[in-house]
Design a protein with these regions (language model features):
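Sec-dependent, cleavable N-terminal signal peptides
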Residues: 1-22
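Helix-centric, low-specificity signal for extended rod-like, repetitive segments
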Residues: 12, 127-129, 217-218
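Short, surface-exposed polybasic-aromatic patches that bind anionic ligands, especially phosphate groups
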Residues: 23-200
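A short, hydrophobic C-terminal helix/tail in secreted or cell-surface proteins
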Residues: 203-223
């Protein structure tokens, strides 16, 4: 294998990744049974790769994906389009935002959203506005946005996952990479809007292509050394 061709292919993958993440945006909407979440997000071309991580008919309708907000004191307009930065934390806003200016999402939030996105919640959940509201309440509690959660059964999922001490352990900082926060802004970044959750899977968008390119480069260099030997 020609090393120059491999390096060119790798550079193309990296350039493609940079272009894909150049200007991601979402159009936000209110709850829709077709999308499954408390809110819905329609990604533009630069972010639509996330749709493949959701389950059609449950957490996505193929165009929108269901999402939940993690800040109670910031907002979005129904039908509004917002710039997106993928992060692991809410920025600035939020009732519980610390003096550092950001708030890392909790393990419990990441767990519940993963269950939602991958279609693992009970069949009765999907398409129910009432159940979506209950799950949103629990996520707000996990994120310190309110002091209690509404009536529902989703806290039983946290008990099963985190054990008897779930009310403490589920609120610990999430250190994984499958669930991200969409930091939403408008007015060219001057206005901070309500941050939302997104499931990017593991590895997240573009990483697979980069890993493949690096793997091919490694094979090419190894072959070159063996020929010299």
């Amino acid at each position: 294998m020609n090393p120059k061709l491999v390096i060119f292919a790798l550079a193309t993958c990296v350039a493609g990744l940079s272009q894909a993440l150049a200007n991601p945006q979402v159009q936000m909407g209110i709850y829709s049974p077709a999308s499954g979440g408390n809110y819905r997000a329609n990604p533009n071309a630069e972010l639509e790769w996330v749709l493949s991580n959701y389950v059609t008919g449950k957490s996505t309708d193929g165009t929108y994906f269901g999402t939940f907000c993690i800040e109670k004191n910031e907002y979005f307009s129904n039908g509004g389009t917002y710039d997106v930065v993928l992060n692991n934390k809410a920025i600035s806003g939020g009732v519980s935002s610390p003096t550092a200016g950001y708030d890392v999402i909790s393990k419990g939030t990441a767990f519940l959203y993963t269950q939602f996105a991958t279609g693992m919640l009970s069949a009765s959940y999907y398409g129910s506005a009432a159940n979506a509201a209950k799950l949103q309440d629990l996520i707000w509690w996990l994120e310190g946005e309110q002091t209690s959660w509404g009536a529902g059964t989703y806290n039983s999922l946290l008990l099963a996952e985190f054990g008897a001490n779930w009310q403490v352990d589920a609120r610990a900082d999430y250190t994984g990479s499958a669930v991200k926060v969409m930091n939403l802004t408008s007015n060219q970044g001057r206005t901070q809007n309500q941050d939302q959750l997104v499931y990017v899977g593991v590895p997240d968008g573009g990483t697979t292509a980069m890993m493949l390119g690096l793997g091919l480069l490694g094979i090419a260099l190894a072959n070159r050394k063996s020929r010299r030997g």
